[in-house]
């Protein structure tokens, strides 16, 4: 006997309508100040409308009123989970306009710390993603690795998070003597064992797989249409990585693989990041082994300030130092777009110079913005708890998204 269902769920005078609920902006799984207006049919998501901009601070406008050097710390405060990844795009853009050479040691140090930043970022994302779907222990272990990363940042630059260490022309200061050997030992003796232990708890865990496998499947075509980048597009099976396709600094000297997913679901995105951590460690080892001697900043005195020791002996050095930290250097008129492979995807800086000491315009291309626009597409037809897993797999930080 077949049951016949009425086309309309309306009975008598009662009209059954969909729920409309707010997810965030104070939700712990929103990873910041995301507000999503959800339309639910029972517990199934019919529609999602993400509301962004709650952390908008007018960064692009503020940069227009600062010198090129004063604008640098604003980038640390965009994606504050991977600050050096943000600085990297900006300093490369300024260097391209200035047309200056960066010493080889500075390039190696930049790549070394860009990859350490990637590991640091992925520890936070993988740990919080696992916690969002209900597991507690791996997050605590991954935060131990993240703490080690922050200690390395502090030893190199003096600050744990907002380093402002990358500078136009190189890096601000050389690393302490023992730091590179400590990093090499840390990769072998602490990073790999601790990370492998933490991942052994989740990658084959039945509950974790049920929460992530076949959730928010995005095909190659859809990933390209939505403008995905980083682990989001690689999770869909497209080996697109700016470190390989458009290498900058010394990435063309590094040997590493690009991990890609097979089915384009949340589990694949998670596993892409897991493998990226191992590849980043591989790049770091190569940087430490190949690290050359030499200066860590350009010798162009019209851009890079002189060292303290030089200022104590030379009047010209003192004048240059004073001018560079008050007026700043002038950048030739022109425009440039530079994108780097930040831990979350393609982070781009479009810089326009009018020949003065301040940027005429600095457009920031965030990674999470194009990923969030696909939330409705990815969540449709899934259950309400799946939205947290989907959001966790995107890896979004609102300092960068809202700018």
UniProtKB/Swiss-Prot annotation:
It catalyses: a quinone + NADH + 5 H(+)(in) = a quinol + NAD(+) + 4 H(+)(out). SUPFAM superfamilies: HydB/Nqo4-like. One of its GO terms (cellular component) is plasma membrane. It is an enzyme of class 7 (translocase). It is found in: Cell inner membrane. The keyword Aminoacyl-tRNA synthetase does not apply. Disulfide bonds: none annotated. One of its GO terms (molecular function) is quinone binding. The keyword Cytoplasm does not apply. Its main location: membrane. Its EC number is 7.1.1.-. Keywords: Cell inner membrane, Cell membrane, Membrane, NAD, Quinone, Translocase, Transport, Ubiquinone. It is a peripheral membrane protein. It holds the Pfam family Complex1_49kDa. Belongs to the complex I 49 kDa subunit family. NDH-1 is composed of 14 different subunits. Subunits NuoB, C, D, E, F, and G constitute the peripheral sector of the complex. NCBIfam families: NuoD, PRK06075.1. PANTHER family: NADH DEHYDROGENASE [UBIQUINONE] IRON-SULFUR PROTEIN 2, MITOCHONDRIAL, NADH-UBIQUINONE OXIDOREDUCTASE 49 KDA SUBUNIT. NDH-1 shuttles electrons from NADH, via FMN and iron-sulfur (Fe-S) centers, to quinones in the respiratory chain. The immediate electron acceptor for the enzyme in this species is believed to be ubiquinone. Couples the redox reaction to proton translocation (for every two electrons transferred, four hydrogen ions are translocated across the cytoplasmic membrane), and thus conserves the redox energy in a proton gradient. This is NADH-quinone oxidoreductase subunit D. It comes from Novosphingobium aromaticivorans (strain ATCC 700278 / DSM 12444 / CCUG 56034 / CIP 105152 / NBRC 16084 / F199).
């Amino acid at each position: 006997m077949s049951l016949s269902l009425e086309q309309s769920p309306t009975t008598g005078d009662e009209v059954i309508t969909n729920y409309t609920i707010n997810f965030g902006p104070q939700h712990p799984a929103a990873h910041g100040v995301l507000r999503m207006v959800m339309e639910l049919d029972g517990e199934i998501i019919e529609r999602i409308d993400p509301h962004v901009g709650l952390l908008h601070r007018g960064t692009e406008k503020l940069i227009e009123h600062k010198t090129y050097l004063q604008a640098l710390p604003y980038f640390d405060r965009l994606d504050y989970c991977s600050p050096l990844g943000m600085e990297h795009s900006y300093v490369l853009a300024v260097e391209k306009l200035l047309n200056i050479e960066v010493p080889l040691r500075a390039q190696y140090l930049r790549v070394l710390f860009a990859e350490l930043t990637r590991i640091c970022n992925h520890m936070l994302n993988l740990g919080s993603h696992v916690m969002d779907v209900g597991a507690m222990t791996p997050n605590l272990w991954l935060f131990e690795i993240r703490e080690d990363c922050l200690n390395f940042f502090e030893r190199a630059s003096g600050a744990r998070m907002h380093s402002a260490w990358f500078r136009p022309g190189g890096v601000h200061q050389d690393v302490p003597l023992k730091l590179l050997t400590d990093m090499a030992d840390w990769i072998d003796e602490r990073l790999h064992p601790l990370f492998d232990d933490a991942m052994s708890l989740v990658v084959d865990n039945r509950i974790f797989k049920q929460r992530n496998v076949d959730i928010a499947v995005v095909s190659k075509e859809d990933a390209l249409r939505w403008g995905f980048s980083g682990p989001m597009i690689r999770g869909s099976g497209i080996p697109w990585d700016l470190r390989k396709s458009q290498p900058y600094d010394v990435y063309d000297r590094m040997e590493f693989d690009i991990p890609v997913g097979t089915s384009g679901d949340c589990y694949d995105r998670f596993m892409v990041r897991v493998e990226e951590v191992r590849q980043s460690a591989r790049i770091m080892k190569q940087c430490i082994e190949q690290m050359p001697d030499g200066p860590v900043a350009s010798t162009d005195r019209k851009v890079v300030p002189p060292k303290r020791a030089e200022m104590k002996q030379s009047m010209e050095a003192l004048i240059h130092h004073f001018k560079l930290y008050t007026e700043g250097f002038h950048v030739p008129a022109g425009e440039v777009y530079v994108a780097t492979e930040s831990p979350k995807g393609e982070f781009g800086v479009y810089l326009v110079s009018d020949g003065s000491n301040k940027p005429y315009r600095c457009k920031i291309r965030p990674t999470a913005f194009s990923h969030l626009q696909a939330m409705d597409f990815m969540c449709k037809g899934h259950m309400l708890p799946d939205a947290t897993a989907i959001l966790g797999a995107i890896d979004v930080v609102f300092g960068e998204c809202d700018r």
